[in-house]
């Protein structure tokens, strides 16, 4: 079950591009709406299941959803499930979201948070360089040469009426390959 958007202060949030539509069912829909409507540059949300992915998708904003061992979450945030909850960074561009992620890095401890047991895992999955430096890559052919990305179709829940989404995944993999990256499909 997803979180629901609700506000006793000003009513429920609506999609800023079409106010007759919901901003999504994610509990961080206000975060997505505020970024999409240019009220703020970025917003932090909490995700248990799809509370930041839904608002990012429905409001056309970028999202960085770090894994639990990258960004500490046990510093006072209220979540529904300690095993699933994590922070999401919503912004107008992926570059802005990466800059926020870099700003959340502690100068002494990096991304380690002594209050969060998940950040004590091996740090091999954390870049030593700022994340924002990796968002400025050119879109020219071959710019992604040597990189690999996985398109895992088994995890995509596609109902029979949504078979039209299958060609989208295949064409996205073709675009990735044209940029020089090695997509592997499963």
Write out the residue ranges for each language-model feature.
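Conserved dinucleotide-binding and phosphotransfer motif residues
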Residues: 179
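A short helix-breaking turn/cap at a secondary-structure junction
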Residues: 65-167, 171
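Alpha-helical scaffold elements within enzyme catalytic domains, especially in hydrolases
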Residues: 174-175
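Short glycine/serine-rich loop/turn segments
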Residues: 1-87, 115-120, 152-155
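General small-molecule cofactor/ligand-binding pocket signal
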Residues: 182-186
């Amino acid at each position: 079950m997803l979180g629901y958007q609700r506000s006793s202060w000003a009513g429920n949030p609506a999609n800023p591009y079409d106010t007759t539509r919901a901003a999504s069912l994610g509990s961080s829909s206000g975060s997505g709406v505020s970024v999409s409507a240019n009220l703020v540059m970025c917003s932090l949300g909490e995700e248990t299941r799809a509370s930041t992915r839904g608002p990012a998708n429905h409001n056309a904003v970028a999202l960085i959803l770090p894994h639990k061992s990258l960004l500490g979450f046990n510093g006072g945030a209220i979540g529904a499930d300690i095993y699933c909850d994590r922070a999401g960074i919503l912004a107008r561009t992926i570059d802005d979201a990466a800059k926020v992620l870099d700003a959340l890095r502690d100068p002494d401890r990096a991304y380690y948070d002594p209050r969060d047991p998940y950040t004590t895992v091996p740090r091999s999955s954390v870049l030593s360089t700022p994340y924002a430096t990796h968002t400025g890559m050119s879109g020219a052919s071959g710019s992604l040469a040597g990189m690999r990305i996985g398109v895992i179709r088994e995890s995509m829940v596609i109902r029979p009426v949504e078979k039209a989404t299958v060609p989208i995944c295949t064409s996205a993999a073709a675009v990735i390959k044209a940029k020089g990256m090695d997509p592997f499909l499963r």
